[in-house]
UniProtKB/Swiss-Prot annotation:
Residues reported to bind Mg(2+): 563, 567
Keyword Transmembrane: yes
Protein name as catalogued: Probable copper-transporting P-type ATPase B
Domain of life: Bacteria
Species: Staphylococcus aureus
Active site annotation, chain numbering: 365
Taxonomic lineage of the native organism: Bacteria, Bacillati, Bacillota, Bacilli, Bacillales
Keyword ATP-binding: yes
GO molecular function, one term: P-type monovalent copper transporter activity
Membrane topology designation: Multi-pass membrane protein
Length: 672
């Protein structure tokens, strides 16, 4: 199957003011400009000093003028056009500075040519054609290299888009196979995927079994065994067997497209630090122009040498690099959000990366976050002579049969495993923070937790409850006619990575807090095993939100980790909301960060990525600002008295290097 680049996702973010110039344009312009520049360099003296390889003959100055004019308008076009764009948006920056520099050099050289050839003056006026040629060449080469570096720092989205194949094998009538374009695939179509091929769309396996490599899509390092009715993600690699997949999502609704959309949006949103760097970069233009003009005036007063003074002005204009400052944060952001996406960490809100450095407490739901959420039934019992234990289990399963809560799934699966049939329930309603109610076989039933029994003054066996709860069971009761008629106790397994995650949080001076609707005994048992000392149990959904508010009222920064749907109010209330175990449903509204997998270690991965991201941002900001603070005065000739003078060509090299260093530094960002 062919692969394509999904062009609509390629230009996912704007890195500075020349994002509309492809690096290929700079490459071709550089080599064509080199053809015009070489004769200028050979025929024209540098700063009036003739170099050993240079020659001149009658009419050579006219050749230099013609070639320099072509070079100025052809090789200089990206900078002149860029300056026009910047000025039209009232945001003059690097392109305007470069355009000013080459324009001053070219216009003054025209004046020098006139003075030397038509004025009749006996004194020779030095031109800047040599400097103009080398300046344009270096700037084109620098931008070509820079665009490659910038592209490498932020092109992970393009790589994600390329994971999707261009075509797929679709099953049509009588099991005939037809290769069609991805755009011709629709929901409920059946596609066949052979070993080693990319899964073309999100879907469900309807035939066959295989192992799937999701590492490039969700960051899952191990191959995942998939069989009938299992979900597969478009872009993942089919490992060992041929499978037939029923399409469940196409185009923009697919997992990869949603991820790319979210990452694209996050990269284009500006954080506070980026807004500050943009503002400073904007001021830098006026700073450079001011220093350039001041240096020109000062050197004219000191030496009365227009050539030297003009060289200072041009060097200042080309050496100043607001671009390095402007790219300092966007490049790191592009790299960071892309790394996150490849590892199943979808960063929706850019500011969460900055806030993560100041988190004091991480509050977590127990079920599904710290524990597997796969509940096994350890005990069930009838409390009425009218129904035996199996009939009580059947009623539990009936009422829970339409729910996707982990407790409900555990009961239904257990009943199926024991071949116990159950009826279809009627009028089922959730009771928030309690359980649910409904009608089964004309019986009005409720499944509730122990908090409900206590608050409603129901009579129940408290000793039995305590014994089961201390074994780590979540306990539910069945009520009919205000009588407790049955009990079911379910055990959950703590995730292997939970204990390490809690240990890592404590080592970072972040306090883990458990918030759960489960009973206190179970919560305490899990908390003690994990080393969590701060536990809040038997909570209603609104209780979690109010607890977060209480902690925040003391000035603490809170990150909440929980279910993107059930814990939505808490995720929104927290300083950072992290929705865990979203799977392919990454379009969850609540949550600044979305964890595709239900792996607690991804919480630490996010904190590590955030820390490394901020470190790179600070490094780039210091470099971008520090470079300009040092380079601009040097270009102005502040150390000329000790012989340290920078030519425009050297200034251009330094300016290009400054941006390349920022891009390379961003590219070295790692998850851990």
């Amino acid at each position: 199957m062919e692969h394509h680049s999904h062009q609509e996702h390629e230009n996912h973010t704007s890195h500075g003011n020349h994002e509309h110039h492809h690096h290929g344009n700079f490459k071709s312009k550089f080599f064509i400009s080199l053809i015009f520049a070489i004769p200028i360099i050979i025929l024209s003296p540098m700063m009036g000093v003739k170099l050993p390889f240079q020659i001149s003959f009658t009419g050579s100055d006219w050749i230099v003028l013609i070639l320099a004019t072509i070079l100025f308008f052809y090789g200089g076009k990206p900078f002149l056009s860029g300056a026009k764009d910047e000025i039209s948006t009232k945001k003059p920056g690097m392109m305007t500075l470069v355009a000013l520099g080459i324009s001053v050099a070219y216009i003054y050289s025209l004046y020098a040519f006139y003075m030397n050839n038509f004025s009749g003056s006996s004194t020779h006026t030095m031109d800047f054609f040599w400097e103009l040629a080398t300046l344009i060449l270096i700037m084109l080469l620098g931008h070509w290299i820079e665009m490659n570096a910038v592209g490498n720092a932020g092109n992970a989205l393009k790589k994600m888009a390329e994971l999707l194949p261009n075509t797929a094998v679709k099953l049509i009538d009588n099991n005939q196979r037809e290769e069609v374009k991805i755009s011709d695939i629709h929901i409920d179509d059946i596609v066949e995927v052979r070993a080693g091929e990319s899964i073309p769309t999100d879907g469900i396996i309807v035939r066959g079994e295989t192992s799937i490599d999701e590492s490039l899509v969700t960051g899952e390092s191990k191959k995942v065994h998939k069989t009938h009715n299992d979900d597969v993600i478009g872009g993942s690699i089919n490992g060992s067997g041929t499978v037939q997949v029923k399409v469940t999502a196409t185009g923009e609704n697919g997992y990869l497209s949603q991820v790319m959309g979210l990452v694209n949006q996050a990269q284009n949103d500006k954080s506070k630090a980026e807004l500050l760097s943009d503002k400073v970069a904007g001021y830098l233009f006026y700073f450079a122009v001011s220093i350039g003009l001041i240096s020109f005036i000062v050197w004219m007063l000191i030496q009365n040498n227009v050539d030297f003074a003009l060289e200072r002005l041009v060097t200042v204009l080309v050496i100043a690099c607001p671009h390095a400052l402007g790219l300092a944060i966007p490049l790191v952001t592009a790299r960071s959000t892309s790394i996150g996406a490849h590892n199943g960490l979808i960063i929706k809100n850019r500011e969460s990366v900055e806030i993560a450095q100041h988190i004091d407490y991480i509050m977590m739901d127990k079920t599904g976050t710290l524990t597997e959420g796969n509940f096994s039934v350890n005990h069930y019992e009838s409390f009425t002579d009218e129904l035996n234990n199996e009939e009580i289990l059947s009623l539990f399963a009936s009422l829970e049969s339409n729910s996707n809560h982990p407790l409900a799934t555990g009961i239904v699966d257990f009943a199926k495993g024991k071949n116990i049939s159950y009826a279809t329930p009627q009028e089922v309603n959730n009771i928030p923070g309690v359980g649910l109610e409904g009608t089964v076989d004309n019986k009005k039933l409720k499944i509730v937790n122990v908090s409900y029994l206590d608050k409603s003054n129901f009579d129940y066996n408290k000793e039995q409850f305590t014994n089961l709860a201390q074994q780590g069971n979540s306990i539910s009761y069945l009520i009919h006619d205000r009588q407790v008629i049955g009990i079911i106790a379910q055990g959950d397994k703590i995730k292997e990575s939970s204990k390490q995650m809690v240990s890592d949080l404590l080592s970072r001076n972040i306090t883990p807090v458990m918030l759960t609707g489960d009973n206190k005994e179970v919560a305490q048992t899990v908390a003690e095993e994990l080393g969590i000392s701060d536990v809040h149990a038997q909570l209603m959904p609104e209780d979690k939100e109010s607890i977060i508010q209480d902690y925040q009222s003391n000035g603490s920064k809170i990150m909440m980790v929980g279910d993107g749907i059930n814990d939505a109010p808490s995720l929104i209330r927290a300083d950072i909301g992290m929705a865990i175990g979203a799977g392919t449903d990454v379009a969850i509204e609540s949550g600044d960060v979305i964890l595709v997998k239900s792996n607690p270690s991804d919480i630490i991965n996010f904190l590590s990525l955030s820390k490394n991201t901020m470190k790179k941002m600070v490094q780039n900001l210091w470099w971008g600002a520090g470079y300009n603070v040092i380079a601009v005065p040097l270009a102005a000739g502040i150390l000329a008295s000790i012989g340290l003078i920078l030519s425009p060509a050297v200034g251009a090299i330094l300016m290009s290097l400054s941006t390349i260093i920022v891009a390379i530094n961003a590219f070295t960002l790692k998850l851990k």
